[in-house]
Amino acid sequence: MITLNTEKSFVELKHITKRFGNNTVIDDLNLAIPQGKMVTLLGPSGCGKTTVLRAVAGLEKPTEGQIFIDGEDVTERSIQQRDICMVFQSYALFPHMSLGENIGYGLKMLGRPKAEINQRVKEALALVDLEGFEDRYVDQISGGQQQRVALARALILKPKVLLFDEPLSNLDANLRRSMREKIRELQQQFNITSLYVTHDQSEAFAVSDMVLVMNKGKIMQLGAPQELYRQPASRFMASFMGDANIFPATFTADSVNIYGYLIPRPQGFAAGLSESTVGIRPEAITLSHQGEESQRCTITQVAYMGPQYEVQVDWHGQSMLLQVNATQLQPNPGDSYYLQIHPYGMFVLSEQ
């Protein structure tokens, strides 16, 4: 069982397998999520992350395994019996209802008094910065506002577990940024145990306590965002979590040797390691006009990205990607520089 820490588990998935015919989309997955944590499922298309979410919701029954919420086995229960709310990519709002009616619909189905519903709708709208929008309709508000209404509709029911199925994928970049901040703020404010699915790495990092990366139905790595980026467990993880330059290296007690260039050995590298493959993040490499011959490189491609350039260099016959601050240097193809590799952006890779 993969757990986030020593806290008591609130949502548990035990040996979950899901097959569609001969196709196994979840392969013996185990996970335990503590109360109040936000965990994001991240991975390439078809990795099984949405199927995991649907299984927790009760929309997809596992072929094998059990799902527990707050200590109770809910594997055979419907979504209505699990005390769960789900925020969808498509918002799933009723166009013939006002926003207030949309948000209060769940309470109405539970038979709550009208006065209570009206009051809680006002409170929910205030939470998502839409005070006074009760009487508007879906076609009168923007996509970002529609997603806020969908979030308010989920929060008003005070569920034990909140699920998010790629909720920001239909929004533009600026709206995605503000909306993910609002989601994280409210999740922490109400301490709701949450499971979030996205294919966007930056979104996963911004909203999550922990990120679980999947590939081909299996867990590749689970950890805090910084851990996954700085200490990827495999080649797949190194490449999936961002750009990585990968080179063979040898080690001494105090240095890492790559093509004769000696770099101070980072803290945390295993003792006794003599040779391996290392990954280097692009932001850990800088260019200089001075250095040793082993550091000399030639620029082959330059792409302007606004605040920075993405630069490809040829180094000892190998291509390397790095980032250059646009206010400090203006690189051009054919220019010769000396590169410097900073230990903080280096990690040892397994051969997976």
Curated annotation (Swiss-Prot):
It is a peripheral membrane protein. Residues 11-241 form the ABC transporter domain. It comes from the Bacteria. Gene3D superfamilies: 2.40.50.100, P-loop containing nucleotide triphosphate hydrolases. GO terms for cellular component: ATP-binding cassette (ABC) transporter complex, substrate-binding subunit-containing. Keywords: ATP-binding, Cell inner membrane, Cell membrane, Ion transport, Iron, Iron transport, Membrane, Nucleotide-binding, Translocase, Transport. The keyword Cell wall biogenesis/degradation does not apply. ATP binds at G43, P44, S45, G46, C47, G48, K49, T50. GO terms for molecular function: ABC-type ferric iron transporter activity; ATP binding; ATP hydrolysis activity. It is found in: Cell inner membrane. It is an enzyme of class 7 (translocase). Its EC number is 7.2.2.7. It catalyses: Fe(3+)(out) + ATP + H2O = Fe(3+)(in) + ADP + phosphate + H(+). Its main location: membrane. InterPro entries: AAA+_ATPase, ABC_transporter-like_ATP-bd, ABC_transporter-like_CS, ABC_transpr_MalK/UgpC-like, Mo/tungstate-bd_C_term_dom, P-loop_NTPase, Transp-assoc_OB_typ2. Belongs to the ABC transporter superfamily. Fe(3+) ion importer (TC 3.A.1.10) family. The complex is composed of two ATP-binding proteins (FbpC), two transmembrane proteins (FbpB) and a solute-binding protein (FbpA). Part of the ABC transporter complex FbpABC involved in Fe(3+) ions import. Responsible for energy coupling to the transport system. This is Fe(3+) ions import ATP-binding protein FbpC 1. It comes from Pectobacterium atrosepticum (strain SCRI 1043 / ATCC BAA-672). The lineage of its organism: Bacteria, Pseudomonadati, Pseudomonadota, Gammaproteobacteria, Enterobacterales. The gene is fbpC1.
